[in-house]
A protein has these predicted regions:
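Domain-level signal for Mg2+-assisted phosphodiester chemistry and nucleotide/NA-binding surfaces
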Residues: 1-86
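Metal-dependent nucleotidyl/phosphoryl-transfer cores and adjacent nucleic-acid-binding surfaces
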Residues: 3-8, 14, 26, 30, ...
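A generic signature of intrinsically disordered, low-complexity regions enriched in glycine/proline
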Residues: 8, 54, 61, 65, ...
């Protein structure tokens, strides 16, 4: 399991916040989400996991235009990383010049595992999904998305083409302009002649032929930002899952999570699978 840690943590942070930040509650929500995902009885996957890797933003793209997080956000993030390491023996990936989704892509393509589950709420990472071994678990839907679902949602023929679709319609969340005035229906028409067996370069070339010259600069500028970098140096392999004794959970100040943790510990350390 390779986790887009910033996506998971940000959701927990803002869900915990009412008026003022609530770091302890944010920690509990983030850790509880991971415990639910590790438990085959609650993860809606029905599968166990033997290795984990959490990928964090080391740099924020200034083009996204997002406001700076408060100091407590970053301090709590470091506490969460430490707790996850103690609880699960997990590995963490972070690079000062790259965002977490690039680290996820690098780790996914480097892995030789039979099945890889990407955990994220970021639509950009859907482009890594394949029918065979790479699966996208959506934190928003709380389920693994099928390839057919992703293709239908974005009007494409393969998940790897999401970057092209986003370069056309834009993405206000990441401040990506796209082609002004072009939306999902335009993507659907542009992809009518695209087939699932076409390689990525051929897809871009075919779409390029249908884009008026005055829009091509916007398209390629946006495409450069929607593509994932899968060659980030120094990304570690996912680490074997090693769970601490449940008695130690209370000592970490996580008393409310003891029950959920104990169940996961029992499944992985007592029950055969």
């Amino acid at each position: 399991m390779i986790i887009d840690a910033n996506s998971l943590y940000a959701r927990s942070w803002f869900a915990a916040q009412r008026v003022d930040p609530d770091p302890p509650q944010a920690l509990r929500l983030a850790i509880n989400t991971i415990l639910l995902l590790l438990n085959p009885n609650t993860n809606r996957i029905g599968s166990h996991f033997d290795r984990t890797l959490f990928c964090w933003d080391g740099a924020q793209n200034p083009n996204k235009g997002r406001s700076e997080k408060p100091p407590e956000y970053h301090q709590t993030k470091e506490v969460l990383k430490e707790i996850l390491t103690l609880l699960l023996g997990t590995a963490h990936a972070e690079h000062p010049h790259y965002e977490g989704d690039d680290l996820v892509a690098t780790a996914v393509y480097a892995s030789k595992a039979d099945h890889i589950y990407i955990v994220s709420g970021d639509k950009d990472l859907m482009q890594l999904q394949t029918n065979e071994r790479i699966h996208y678990y959506c934190l928003n839907n709380k389920a693994v998305l099928s390839t057919a679902f992703i293709n239908q949602r974005w009007h494409i023929k393969r998940p790897s083409q999401i970057s092209v679709a986003l370069a056309i319609i834009g993405d206000p969340v990441d401040n990506i302009q796209g082609i002004r005035g072009w939306g999902p229906k335009k993507v659907q028409r542009l992809f009518e002649d695209i087939t699932p067996d076409m390689d990525f370069g051929s897809v871009v070339q075919a779409i390029d032929a249908k884009i008026p010259e005055e829009h091509k600069a916007s398209f390629y500028e946006s495409l450069e930002r929607t593509l994932l970098n899968s060659d980030v140096p120094g990304v570690p392999e996912p680490a074997p899952l090693v769970l601490v004794d449940p008695k130690e959970v209370a000592e970490m100040g996580l008393t409310s999570l003891q029950g959920a943790y104990r169940e996961v510990y029992h499944i992985y350390n007592v029950e055969p699978f």
